[in-house]
Swiss-Prot record:
Belongs to the NAD-dependent DNA ligase family. LigA subfamily. It catalyses: NAD(+) + (deoxyribonucleotide)n-3'-hydroxyl + 5'-phospho-(deoxyribonucleotide)m = (deoxyribonucleotide)n+m + AMP + beta-nicotinamide D-nucleotide. CDD domains: BRCT_DNA_ligase_like, LIGANc. This is DNA ligase 1. The active site is at 118 (n6-amp-lysine intermediate). It comes from Clostridium acetobutylicum (strain ATCC 824 / DSM 792 / JCM 1419 / IAM 19013 / LMG 5710 / NBRC 13948 / NRRL B-527 / VKM B-1787 / 2291 / W).
Length: 663
C-alpha cells in the first residue's frame, strides 16, 4: 500500500508542476513508466485511492445527461467592444465607491481591478465537499446545468481531491490545447470527422456520453472563481490565490489601479493571444474588493462589477454571390448577403448581414466580389469590405424600389428602406401578430407562427385588433383546427384582454423597447395614457432610457395608424392595468431573502419576482445578513446553514400566510 501511495503522491506532484506551474520536473517517458506501474499495482491489490491519477479517465458509456441546479447563478458578463466602454466601466465603479463613502461610515476601499484572460472553452462548475470532488456541471442556463462529473474526471489537471475540507463550487473553463487538437486529428479512426476548433473540441468532449472519447481529447482547465463558498475572502485576488493553493490551475491575472494600467494589461494579453496553447477571445476586468462587488449588484443579465472586453473577431474572405431582401416586423427591408460557403472560426458561413444600402456603398460591396468576412463577437457574420483580389465580373447591388413580398412602393427613412403596407404585407403582419401573442407580451397560449400565417392568408387578418374579432367557426376552417383547439385559442385570446400594462406596452412592438424598458416605463408613468403622452424630456429621465429609445417612443405614438389601432383594441375590450406593489406594508420590504428547495406554487423565477415585488432583496446564498429563508422540499445545505446561523426559516405555507396578512 505504501508503494501505491508514494507513486500517487509523486505523480500528482509531477502533474501539478506540469499543468499548473508549467514547469515539468520529469520526462514524459519517466512519468509514463511510473503511471503504468501504479496502474498494475492497483489492479493486483484492488486498492483504489480516489485521488489517484488513474481515476481521471473513465471507461463507461452513460445513458443520458442529468440536469443539476447550481447553488448560485453563473452569470454571463456585459461586453465592451471599445476601450472607451472599459473606461466608462472603470469610471462607474469609481463613482459608485465615492458616492457610497459620502453616505456611509464604513468606507469602501479605493477601487482596484483584476484583469484576466477571457477563456474561450466550455464553462464548468465543480463542487467539492469534505476535500472531494462530488460533482461537475456545465453552465447551462446559468441556474441549471448538465451533470458531467464522469466526463470531468478526464480533465488532466482537475483535482479529484483538495486540502480544503469545506464546501466550495469552483468556476472555470475546460479547454482543448492546440497540441491536443493536432494530435487528435492526426490519429483519427476510419470515418471520424476532424475537429474544427478548440472550443468545439472541449464542448464536444464534455458533452459526450462515451467517457473514452472524452479522454481522447486530453482536456485541461483553468479556474477563475468560486461560485459558492463557505470560506470568507475579502478580495477576488484572494480567491485566485486560494484556488492555486488547492492545486487548481488559475488564469493569469494582473491587479490594476486605474484605466491606464488596465489598458496596458489588455494590450499585453492581446500581444500573446496567438502564442497561447488555448483560445481566448478577450479580457475580463473585475473589481477586486468583494464587498464593493456585492453592493454594486447585478442587472437582469450580468454583474455590474465586471465587464468583458472583446478582441476583434477573426476574419476570412469569400465570394458574395447574391443579395436577398427581407422584411421585418417594423416594415424595414434588410439586405442579407448570400455567400460562397466558407469556414470561419470552425463554422460554415453561407449568409451575412449587410446592414443597409449606405453601408453597402461605403464598403464598395458588389455581387461577385471577394469580401472580407468577420464574425462580430464570434457569433454574427458581417461583411467588412472587399478585397483587392476579386476576379471576374462584378455587378452593382441595387436597392429594390418595390417590396419583394407585396409589391408596394418602398420609402427611405434615414439609411433604411421601409415597406409602409402594414395591412397586406405578409412578413410584417405575421411577425407583428406573433410578437403580440408571445409569452412576454399578451401571452396567448397555443399561438404559433403557422397559425399567424393562416390567419393572414385565409381569414384576411390585417391588424392586431382583428385577432379579437375571430370566431370559433372561422378557426375551424383552418388546417389542423378542430373543435377543442379552436375553443382553446378563442378562450386564450379572450383571456388576454385583461393584461398587465408592461406586457401590453411590450406587445405593441415599439422600436427599441424590450420587456425591461416596458416595465421601467410602467413603473415611472403608472398608466398607458401617461406613457403615450410622455414627452421626450420626460422619457430620458427614466433610468436606462437614452435619446434613441425616447425618440422611438415619441415617434411611435405620433403615428395616426397607431392611434387608430390602439383605439380599436380598447373598444374590443383590451384593458391593460398597472398595479403598484405596496411594498411599504410588506414584512419583506428591504429584507434579504433566500429561497431554497422545491416550492409547490413557484418556479425559481416566479419566487424571485414575487419577493422583489414585495420589496425584498433576493440572495443566492445564506449569510449572517440573511433575514429569511423560504424552504421547500429537499432544501439541503442552505437550510442547514440557516439553522446554524439562526436565520428565520419560513415554509411556503407560512410565506403565503404573511403575504395574505398584509392585503
Amino acid at each position: 500500500m505504501k508503494l501505491i501511495e508514494d507513486l500517487i503522491e509523486k505523480l500528482n506532484k509531477y502533474s501539478y508542476s506540469y499543468y499548473v506551474l508549467d514547469n515539468p520536473i520529469v520526462a514524459d517517458k519517466e512519468y509514463d513508466i511510473m503511471y503504468d506501474e501504479l496502474k498494475r499495482l492497483e489492479e493486483e491489490t484492488e486498492y483504489i485511492n480516489p485521488n489517484s491519477p488513474t481515476q481521471r479517465v473513465g471507461d463507461i458509456i452513460l445513458d443520458k445527461f442529468e440536469k443539476t441546479h447550481h447553488k448560485n447563478k453563473l452569470w454571463s458578463l456585459d461586453k465592451a467592444q471599445k476601450k472607451d466602454e472599459v473606461k466608462a466601466f472603470v469610471n462607474k465603479c469609481v463613482k459608485f465607491v465615492e458616492q457610497y463613502n459620502l453616505t456611509h461610515s464604513e468606507k469602501l476601499p479605493s477601487p482596484q481591478f483584476v484583469v484576466t484572460q477571457k477563456l474561450d472553452g466550455l464553462t464548468i462548475n465543480c463542487s467539492y465537499n469534505e476535500s472531494r470532488l462530488i460533482k461537475s456541471a456545465t453552465r447551462g442556463t446559468g441556474e441549471i446545468g448538465e451533470d458531467i462529473t464522469e466526463q470531468s474526471k478526464t480533465i488532466l489537471n482537475l483535482p479529484n481531491a483538495i486540502n480544503y475540507s469545506g464546501e466550495i463550487d469552483v468556476h472555470g473553463e475546460a479547454l482543448m490545447t492546440k497540441n491536443a487538437l493536432e494530435q487528435y486529428n492526426s490519429n483519427l479512426k476510419v470515418n471520424e470527422t476532424p475537429l474544427k476548433n478548440l472550443r468545439n473540441g472541449a464542448a464536444g468532449a464534455l458533452r459526450n456520453l462515451n467517457i473514452k472519447e472524452t479522454a481522447r481529447r486530453k482536456l485541461v482547465a483553468q479556474f477563475y472563481d468560486l461560485s459558492y463558498t463557505d470560506k470568507k475572502l475579502k478580495k477576488y485576488s484572494e480567491i485566485l490565490l486560494f484556488l492555486k493553493s488547492q492545486g487548481f490551475n488559475i488564469t493569469e491575472y494582473n491587479i490594476c489601479n486605474n484605466f491606464d494600467e488596465i489598458n496596458q494589461a489588455i494590450d499585453n494579453i492581446g500581444e500573446v493571444r496567438s502564442s497561447l496553447q488555448y483560445d481566448i477571445d478577450g479580457v475580463v476586468i473585475r473589481l477586486n474588493d468583494i464587498e464593493t462587488s456585492r453592493l454594486m449588484g447585478y442587472t437582469i443579465k450580468c454583474p455590474k462589477y465586471a465587464i468583458a472586453y472583446k478582441f476583434k473577431a477573426k476574419e476570412t474572405t469569400t465570394k458574395l454571390i447574391d443579395v436577398e431582401w427581407n422584411v421585418g416586423r417594423s416594415g424595414r427591408i434588410n439586405p442579407t448577403a448570400i455567400l460562397e460557403p466558407v469556414e470561419l472560426a470552425g463554422v460554415i458561413v453561407k449568409r451575412a448581414t449587410l446592414n443597409n444600402m449606405d453601408d453597402i456603398k461605403r464598403k464598395k460591396i458588389k455581387k461577385g466580389a471577394r469580401v472580407f468576412l468577420r464574425r462580430s463577437n464570434d457569433v454574427i457574420p458581417e461583411i467588412m469590405g472587399v478585397t483587392e483580389e476579386t476576379e471576374g465580373e462584378t455587378k452593382e447591388i441595387e436597392a429594390p424600389t418595390i417590396c419583394p413580398y407585396c409589391g408596394s412602393e418602398i420609402v427611405k427613412e434615414g439609411v433604411h428602406l421601409f415597406c409602409e403596407n402594414t395591412l397586406s404585407c405578409k412578413p410584417q403582419m405575421v411577425k407583428s401578430i406573433v410578437h403580440f401573442a408571445s409569452r412576454k407580451a399578451m401571452n396567448i397560449e397555443g399561438f404559433s407562427e403557422k397559425t399567424a400565417e393562416q390567419l393572414f392568408e385565409k381569414l384576411n387578418i390585417k391588424s392586431i385588433s382583428d385577432l379579437y374579432r375571430i370566431t370559433k367557426e372561422e378557426l375551424m376552417s383552418l388546417d389542423k383546427f378542430k373543435d377543442k383547439k379552436a375553443s382553446n385559442l378563442i378562450n386564450a385570446i379572450e383571456k388576454s384582454k385583461e393584461c398587465d400594462l408592461d406586457s401590453f406596452v411590450y406587445s405593441l412592438g415599439i422600436p427599441n423597447v424590450g420587456k425591461k424598458t416596458a416595465t421601467d416605463l410602467c413603473k415611472q408613468f403608472k398608466s398607458f395614457e401617461n406613457i403615450k403622452k410622455a414627452s421626450y424630456f420626460e422619457l430620458i429621465l427614466v433610468q436606462d432610457i437614452g435619446s434613441i429609445v425616447a425618440k422611438s417612443i415619441v415617434d411611435f405614438f405620433k403615428q395616426e395608424k397607431i392611434e387608430k389601432s390602439l383605439n380599436e383594441l380598447f373598444k374590443l375590450g383590451v384593458k391593460p392595468s398597472y398595479e403598484e406593489s405596496e411594498v411599504s406594508e410588506s414584512v419583506f420590504n428591504d429584507k434579504t431573502v433566500v429561497a431554497t428547495g422545491s416550492l409547490q406554487n413557484y418556479s425559481r423565477t416566479e419566487i424571485k419576482e414575487k419577493l422583489e415585488s414585495l420589496g425584498a432583496k433576493v440572495a443566492g446564498s445564506v449569510s449572517k445578513k440573511t433575514d429569511y429563508v423560504i424552504a421547500g422540499e429537499n432544501a439541503g445545505s442552505k437550510y442547514d446553514k440557516a439553522v446554524a446561523l439562526g436565520v428565520k426559516i419560513l415554509t411556503e405555507e407560512k410565506f403565503e400566510e404573511l403575504i395574505e396578512s398584509v392585503k
